[in-house]
Amino acid sequence: MYQPEFPPVPFRLGLYPVVDSVQWIERLLDAGVRTLQLRIKDRRDEEVEADVVAAIALGRRYNARLFINDYWRLAIKHQAYGVHLGQEDLQATDLSAIRAAGLRLGVSTHDDMEIDVALAERPSYIALGHVFPTQTKQMPSAPQGLEQLARHVERLADYPTVAIGGISLARAPAVIATGVGSIAVVSAITQAADWRLATAQLLEIAGVGDE
């Protein structure tokens, strides 16, 4: 059995929205979401730090699991719940500093080889993607599909896992049925005609996560 070396997270993180603003963090926390990721791109450093500080404060207020994408130094400085890194960021990041600060670590993967790389670091959870075609981010890899996702989930057994990539409200039940512990969503909420309704429906499918 694989065991994380970073601080653990619940096996089921539940619904896991990935958003790019403090405004979305606050909305979703107010709507009952308890696992989130702040992913900021193309902003000035001082703006990024201000948003990271505000998001972490909100996460604490709601007793939520807030992960900061990429900006691991700021996450350590301001004591975030956790950090999420892509494969391309692992070599350039001081993982021992993240571990020493007591932060959880999530790592993106896209195939078996990248899962091996992630497992070598023993993160808190492993993200599996992208499951379906996605417009949110340019992806060099092909979509995995449900069958491949289920195989990865089985391989990782009791390791906390997160499915990501093109997961819509309609697709969410089939993704959860693979046994994955969490579903990360972006446009399924942020581009929904009624984001509150979409969030409530996705929470009903994926839950808020284990304590």
From Swiss-Prot:
GO terms for cellular component: cytoplasm. It catalyses: 2-[(2R,5Z)-2-carboxy-4-methylthiazol-5(2H)-ylidene]ethyl phosphate + 4-amino-2-methyl-5-(diphosphooxymethyl)pyrimidine + 2 H(+) = thiamine phosphate + CO2 + diphosphate; 2-(2-carboxy-4-methylthiazol-5-yl)ethyl phosphate + 4-amino-2-methyl-5-(diphosphooxymethyl)pyrimidine + 2 H(+) = thiamine phosphate + CO2 + diphosphate; 4-methyl-5-(2-phosphooxyethyl)-thiazole + 4-amino-2-methyl-5-(diphosphooxymethyl)pyrimidine + H(+) = thiamine phosphate + diphosphate. GO terms for molecular function: magnesium ion binding; thiamine-phosphate diphosphorylase activity. Keywords: Magnesium, Metal-binding, Thiamine biosynthesis, Transferase. GO terms for biological process: thiamine biosynthetic process; thiamine diphosphate biosynthetic process. Pfam families: TMP-TENI. Its cofactor is Mg(2+). 2-[(2R,5Z)-2-carboxy-4-methylthiazol-5(2H)-ylidene]ethyl phosphate binds at residues 134-136, 166, 186-187. Pathway: Cofactor biosynthesis; thiamine diphosphate biosynthesis; thiamine phosphate from 4-amino-2-methyl-5-diphosphomethylpyrimidine and 4-methyl-5-(2-phosphoethyl)-thiazole: step 1/1. Its EC number is 2.5.1.3. It comes from the Bacteria. Condenses 4-methyl-5-(beta-hydroxyethyl)thiazole monophosphate (THZ-P) and 2-methyl-4-amino-5-hydroxymethyl pyrimidine pyrophosphate (HMP-PP) to form thiamine monophosphate (TMP). HAMAP family: TMP_synthase. This is Thiamine-phosphate synthase. The gene is thiE.
